[in-house]
Regions:
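Domain-level recognition of soluble alpha/beta enzyme cores
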Residues: 24-125, 147
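Alpha/beta-hydrolase-fold serine-hydrolase catalytic core, especially in secreted/extracellular enzymes
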Residues: 26-28, 32, 314, 323-326, ...
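Active-site machinery of serine-nucleophile hydrolases
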Residues: 79-83, 136-164, 171, 178, ...
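Short substrate-entry loop that stabilizes the transition state in hydrolases
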Residues: 113-164, 269-270, 296-300
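Alpha/beta-hydrolase active-site loop
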Residues: 144, 171-205, 220-221, 231, ...
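Gly/Ala-rich beta-loop-alpha elbow adjacent to hydrolase catalytic centers
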Residues: 211, 215, 219
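Short alpha-helix in the alpha/beta-hydrolase fold that links the catalytic acid
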Residues: 274-276, 299-309
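Short beta-strand/loop motif that positions the catalytic acidic residue
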Residues: 283, 289-291
Length: 435
């Protein structure tokens, strides 16, 4: 190769490096325009992997005349408060492409694998992902909560490819979500009491459930909403004994439950109600619903708003992102997931930026869990008495210019407490007490 050509390639290589996109910040780390409680807590974050095995479980995806029986393997991603900071990590995961072939990609994380745990006893959060998702897509919330003193346990449910729209494929996630959530919660609590492994610092008496989409269906069911008997038939009989009136119905309910967060939860399937009788009215644990007003996957009204109205025996809250769709809880799309419409539609919203959506949710989830799981009454001002429409808030005496301080909330201002000027916009937040 001639010297001139070599020099040209050298210049091109340097230019490519200089012009390369900067590293993406971990989604758990909020931007400077995030509300007050979105910021990371006092603890560094560690992450561990563990597999739980539940023997002799019915698998509706296998077997001819009846579901096959096999051991159920559940890999867990566990985020926890750490004793010291570390370099962080990169989570490697994948989502099903349009052809059913997985598209691999990586997500930056603030957690460090294997770092020593902090001392203390921390509440348990079971974090349940959506249909076809993975725990890594919710790492922003797992890491953020761990930095604030929670042990977050996220099972990988290993659903069939979402491109398979058959009833047979859907039976698996429909059956296993509530069963897996109940099993994981009970086993984590058992190991916490025994001081075992990564759960030695977990407090078995304080548990919260957080679920997105199909995971939202799972956590609401595990919180006490009784399954309609038709779900038994839709799962090849797997859920029949767990449906309302069934011999095992009580086994789905998680013990020591202090709070539930349901993000864009599936509340109707095949245009039928999932739950029997009073449905979510059977839930008594405080519940935070989060949804986009244009969520055409699970529905808004009828849909998630309907469930919020119906859960009359629990104090509940509804955070609505105006014009947002269904993907509100998932990390933003990396370069690998921006090559086709199918791929980017997994992760990105038509209206909202992800670096806004995720910190906004972290703010409200933090306030909610701190109040109802940790008993921090000081967080009530971030939840109660807010003007329902964020766009109508006022702040008399606000300093002129680009003031970056946080609203003090009522009675000084009706701009939502913890928000910067002009940043509480495009949302609704509603509260209804238990009756």
């Amino acid at each position: 190769m001639r010297k001139g050509t070599k020099a040209l390639f050298a210049v091109m290589a340097v230019s490519a490096l200089v012009g390369a996109a900067p590293a993406v910040d971990p989604p758990a780390r909020p931007g400077v325009d995030a509300p007050e409680l979105a910021r990371l807590g006092a603890y560094p974050v560690g992450v561990a992997d563990l597999e739980l095995v539940q023997p002799d479980q019915a698998d509706p995806l296998k077997g001819l005349g009846a579901p096959a029986m096999a051991d159920r393997h559940l890999p867990l991603k566990i985020w926890y408060p750490a004793a010291r900071a570390g370099p962080g990590t990169r989570y490697r995961t994948a989502l099903s492409g349009e052809t059913g072939i997985d598209v691999p990609f990586a997500v930056a994380g603030i957690a460090t694998p294997g770092v020593a745990q902090a001392r203390g006893r921390f509440p348990i959060v079971i974090l349940a992902h959506g249909y076809g998702n993975t725990p890594e897509l919710l790492c922003w919330l797992g890491e953020n909560l761990a930095s604030k003193g929670y042990v977050v346990v996220a099972p990988a449910f290993r659903d069939p490819p979402i491109s398979d729209r058959s009833a047979a494929a859907f039976a698996g996630p429909l059956a296993r979500r509530p069963l897996d959530i109940a099993f994981v919660a009970a086993e984590v609590q058992r190991r916490a009491r025994a001081g075992q492994g990564p759960f030695a610092i977990a407090d078995a008496e304080r548990t919260a459930l957080v679920g997105y989409s199909m995971g939202g269906y799972g956590v609401l069911t595990a919180a006490g909403a009784p399954l309609d008997p038709w779900v038994g038939g839709a799962t090849r009989g797997v859920l029949a004994p767990y449906a309302a009136g069934g011999a095992k119905a009580d086994l789905l309910k998680v013990a020591n439950l202090k709070a539930v967060v349901a993000i864009a939860p599936a509340v109707r399937l095949q245009d039928k109600p999932i739950w029997a009788g009073s449905g979510v009215a059977a839930i008594t644990a405080p519940t935070l619903f989060i949804v986009g007003s244009q969520d055409h996957v699970v529905g808004y009204d009828p849909g998630v708003r309907t469930a919020f109205d119906a859960e009359v025996h629990a104090p509940r809250y509804l955070l609505t992102f105006k014009e947002a769709g269904h993907s509100i809880a998932l990390v933003g799309a990396p370069a690998e997931m921006r090559r086709t419409f199918w791929d980017i539609d997994w992760l990105e919203d038509a209206v909202w930026r992800k670096d806004r959506l995720l910190p906004l949710q972290a703010h409200f989830v933090t306030a909610f869990l701190d109040r109802y799981v940790k008993g921090d009454a000081g967080k009530a001002g971030f939840l109660d008495g807010l003007v329902p429409d964020s766009d109508t808030g006022t702040w008399p005496g606000l300093p002129r210019g680009r003031f970056a301080g946080f609203s003090p909330g009522a009675p000084t201002a009706t701009v939502w407490k913890g928000f910067q000027p002009g940043k509480a916009t495009g949302m609704m937040f509603e509260h209804k007490p238990a009756s």
